Amino acid sequence: MSTIEQALNQTNGAGKVRRDIVRFGDGENDYFTAAGTDEDFAALTEILAKVAESPEQLKKMRDMPMSERPGLVISKGERSSYGYCAKTVLSISKITGTGYKAAAVFAHEFQHQCQYVYGNAQRFAHAFSLKESILEERIGEAAAETAAYQYLYDVKDNNPQAQTAYKAALEKRGMRAYALARRKGESEPDCVLAGMQGYADNLRLA
C-alpha cells in the first residue's frame, strides 16, 4: 500500500475518493496531484490559492521538480496535529479549515518537503549521533515554522482575514522576531535566522 493510500485510509471521511490534480497557478506545471473527495479537492484548491498569494511560496512551489512534489490529502482523523509531510504525501488536517492558518500550515509542511529534497542532512542522517539527530530535527522544525512566519508576513496586508491570521501568529515568539527583522529591513536570510532563533528561544518547543 502506498503512503498516500495509507493517508487516505486514515482520513475516516465519507464520500467517493478520486485522484486528480489541484492547481495553484496558470502555468503548465502549476499543480500537485491529490486524492480525496470533492469536498477535499475544494478545500485544497482554496488553500493553495491562498498559499500562492505569497510570491516566495509561489516560487518555491514552482521550483520543486514535478517528480519530487508530494501528493496532497486532507486528513479528517487527526486531532493533535495540523498536518504532516512524509516525502510522498503532504497532509493538511481538516481541523485547520481553509483559511490563511491552513495556508501557513501548508507553508510549514512544504518546507519539510524542501528539506527532504534539497537538505544535505538527510543524506547523512544514518551517521548522526542521537544528540546530532535531535539537533538536526529541531533545526528543521524551526526552519519549517519560520516558513510559515514568512508566508503570513508576506500576505498580511492582502485582506482582513490575512491580517487576522498574522496577528494571531504574533503570539509566537518566532513570528515576532521574524516580523521585527523584516520591519528593520534586514536581509531575508537574517530574517529567517531571527525567526528560527525566536522559535528556539521557546523552551517548550525547542
Q: Predicted regions span which residues?
A:
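Short pre-active-site segment immediately N-terminal to the catalytic Zn-binding motif
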Residues: 90-106
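Extracytoplasmic/secreted envelope proteins and their assembly/folding machinery
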Residues: 45, 104-107, 141, 145-148
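Auxiliary, metal-adjacent structural segments of Zn-dependent hydrolase domains
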Residues: 13-88
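Solvent-exposed loop/turn segments at secondary-structure junctions
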Residues: 79-80, 96-98, 112, 120-121, ...
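Non-Sec secretion/translocation targeting segments of pathogen effectors
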Residues: 1-9, 144
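Long, well-structured alpha-helical subdomains associated
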Residues: 137, 149-206
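Post-HEXXH active-site segment of zinc metalloproteases
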Residues: 100, 116-142
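Active-site recognition of the HExxH zinc-binding catalytic motif
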Residues: 104-117
